[in-house]
């Protein structure tokens, strides 16, 4: 089976719609084959969406956005945000744009291998890391996030604590010299580090 962390998925494109209740609102999304969690909102993304820290007018990066479920849910709840979506997967970029259009929202969507095509700095980076793509990649995303956060900006990462999340939180502590666990649900935890 093809991995979703790939630039150009080879699987046949099959688009469908799903619904999820996120931030107390039912939201519809287009999903497609070749992306992560296409049949329903995954538990990690739900935790990140419902418990992340967001302030009005913030610049937000949804890193590894997939079909855009995290960033779209946040943007629908707070249209004042300046949101950027990014994913290596061209199909993810296509579906995120389709979902923005579905909800009459505007945001920047960038196809990028990690931070390669991202120049801006953000108040927060939201990340449900592609753990099945490997620990080294996830560590690189954490390390590179530091250089793309404003002063006092925050990295908000969700992961299954007993399936690699513990190691990712240690890496965040190493990179940022601080870590907070702010929420947990169904084995997932939300870890937050602040750029000094």
Name every feature range the model reports, one short phrase each.
Residues 139-151:
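A short glycine-rich, Lys/Arg-flanked "PGG" loop and its adjoining helix->strand segment in the class I
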Residues 1-23, 33-34, 38:
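N-terminal auxiliary segments of SAM/dcSAM-dependent transferases
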Residues 152-160:
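Conserved beta-strand signature within the Rossmann-like core of class I S-adenosyl-L-methionine
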Residues 43-127:
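Conserved SAM/SAH cofactor-binding pocket of Class I
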